[in-house]
């Protein structure tokens, strides 16, 4: 049976914060945990499903992979076993994890490294840039490791073990039947204290700076695609691992083309004499212009497909087409002489209207039949 969407399992939207994900899982865990539903197989399955969703959506790396590739992006995490790969854990362990994070704590009685936050950057591209690809230099305000203390927060000295929590970074507290962990108020979860803080970073181990990065944009990228730059997010506290930078692509509207998948579409205006008599037109494409032969009696709305003049697919390499939509233009601002010629032409058409304007004649016949049948 196909797995359900993790966001659907927890009942949250795709923009849910980590706190909202935790709250949703806590509600489901209280309802379906096997300790509260002994012998209930349905509750057991629902609990496993909720915990799997929680494990993915509360991990920024797993969540990013899931958002981009679906279940295939995280299947190795669970060894292909699906929800069945999880143990239940007792309620204290589960809520110790959740409450610990809410109050700034961590699991396992060990100090937690405070990994740097992930960053997002919107990159606006022209259609030509998105189709052909390029390298773009961007500037990102962020936190970097302090160069003076190399990220330790302690210039010329070493951090000492926190005397309050003995290096665990956590203090255990009892809340009714639950035993939860709370971040140590002295070391703030690090497990170490700095007696001589670095004056440049005030003991944080990092400083604010604008980084200049080169981003390689692959050909065929489109609005909504993301490029992940691993380790280019904010530096972690006290030398902890950095976060990632996600470059979100947005392609600007183009005056001539609009994109649908790997195909490009373009409206091509045409004067009515060329539409009636045929001819040749020069059609712009993203790779230069091409000559298009227009057959006589071309009607408005006719589509011409130029093979291979679309977009090269980002992953498969297949190339789309350019689809030209013909718009027959009615002449405006006619001179008296031009109007006279058109009137003479119209009189000539009326002599054999069924052959010259079959769609018009068929339409009038349909209208006549509609009213006479009532």
UniProtKB/Swiss-Prot annotation:
Gene3D superfamilies for this protein: DnaJ domain, Heat shock protein DnaJ, cysteine-rich domain, Urease metallochaperone UreE, N-terminal domain
Compartments, as annotated in UniProt: Cytoplasm
Gene Ontology biological process: chaperone cofactor-dependent protein refolding; DNA replication; protein refolding; response to heat
PROSITE patterns: DNAJ_1, DNAJ_2, ZF_CR
UniProt xrefs under SUPFAM superfamilies: Chaperone J-domain, DnaJ/Hsp40 cysteine-rich domain, HSP40/DnaJ peptide-binding domain
InterPro entries in the cross-refs: DnaJ, DnaJ_C, DnaJ_domain, DnaJ_domain_CS, HSP40/DnaJ_pept-bd, HSP_DnaJ_Cys-rich_dom, HSP_DnaJ_Cys-rich_dom_sf, J_dom_sf
CDD domains given in the database record: DnaJ (cd06257), DnaJ_C (cd10747), DnaJ_zf (cd10719)
Zn finger limits (CR-type): 133-210
The protein's required cofactors: Zn(2+)
GO MF entries: ATP binding; heat shock protein binding; unfolded protein binding; zinc ion binding
Chain positions recorded as Zn(2+) 1 binding sites: 146, 149, 198, 201
UniProt function note: Participates actively in the response to hyperosmotic and heat shock by preventing the aggregation of stress-denatured proteins and by disaggregating proteins, also in an autonomous, DnaK-independent fashion. Unfolded proteins bind initially to DnaJ; upon interaction with the DnaJ-bound protein, DnaK hydrolyzes its bound ATP, resulting in the formation of a stable complex. GrpE releases ADP from DnaK; ATP binding to DnaK triggers the release of the substrate protein, thus completing the reaction cycle.
HAMAP family: DnaJ
PANTHER family in UniProt: CHAPERONE PROTEIN DNAJ (PTHR43096:SF48), DNAJ HOMOLOG 1, MITOCHONDRIAL-RELATED (PTHR43096)
The protein's name: Chaperone protein DnaJ
Species this protein is from: Coxiella burnetii (strain CbuG_Q212)
């Amino acid at each position: 049976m196909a797995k359900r969407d993790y966001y659907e399992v927890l009942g949250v939207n795709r923009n849910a914060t980590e706190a909202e994900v935790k709250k949703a899982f806590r509600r489901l865990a209280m309802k379906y945990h096997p300790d509260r539903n002994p012998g209930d197989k349905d509750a057991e399955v629902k609990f496993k499903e909720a915990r799997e969703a929680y494990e993915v959506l509360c991990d920024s790396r797993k969540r990013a992979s899931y958002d981009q590739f679906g279940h295939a992006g995280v299947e190795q995490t669970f060894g292909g076993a699906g929800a069945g790969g999880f143990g239940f854990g007792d309620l204290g362990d589960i809520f110790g994890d959740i409450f610990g994070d809410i109050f700034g704590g961590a699991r396992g009685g060990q100090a937690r490294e405070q990994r740097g936050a992930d960053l997002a950057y919107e990159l606006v591209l022209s259609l030509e840039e998105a189709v052909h690809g390029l390298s773009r230099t961007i500037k990102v305000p962020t936190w970097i490791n302090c160069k003076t203390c190399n990220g330790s927060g302690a210039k010329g000295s070493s951090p000492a073990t926190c005397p309050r929590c003995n290096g665990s970074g956590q203090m255990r507290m009892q809340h009714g039947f639950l035993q939860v962990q709370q971040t140590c108020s002295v070391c703030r979860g690090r497990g170490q204290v700095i007696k001589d803080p670095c004056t440049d970073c005030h003991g944080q181990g990092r400083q604010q700076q604008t980084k200049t990065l080169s981003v390689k944009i692959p050909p065929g990228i489109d609005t909504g695609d993301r490029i992940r730059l691993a380790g280019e997010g904010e530096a972690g506290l006290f030398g902890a691992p950095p976060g990632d930078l996600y470059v979100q692509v947005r392609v600007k509207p183009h005056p001539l083309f609009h994109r649908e998948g790997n195909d490009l579409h373009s409206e091509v205006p045409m004067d009515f004499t060329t539409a009636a008599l045929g001819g040749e037109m020069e059609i712009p494409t993203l790779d230069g212009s091409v000559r298009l032969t227009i057959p006589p009696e071309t009607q408005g709305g006719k589509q011409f497909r130029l093979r291979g003049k679309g977009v090269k697919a980002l992953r498969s390499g297949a190339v789309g087409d350019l689809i030209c939509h013909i718009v027959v233009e009615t002449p405006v601002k006619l001179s008296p002489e031009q109007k006279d010629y058109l009137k003479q032409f119209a009189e000539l058409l009326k002599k054999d209207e069924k052959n010259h304007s079959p769609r018009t004649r068929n339409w009038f016949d349909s209208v006549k039949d509609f009213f006479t049948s009532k």
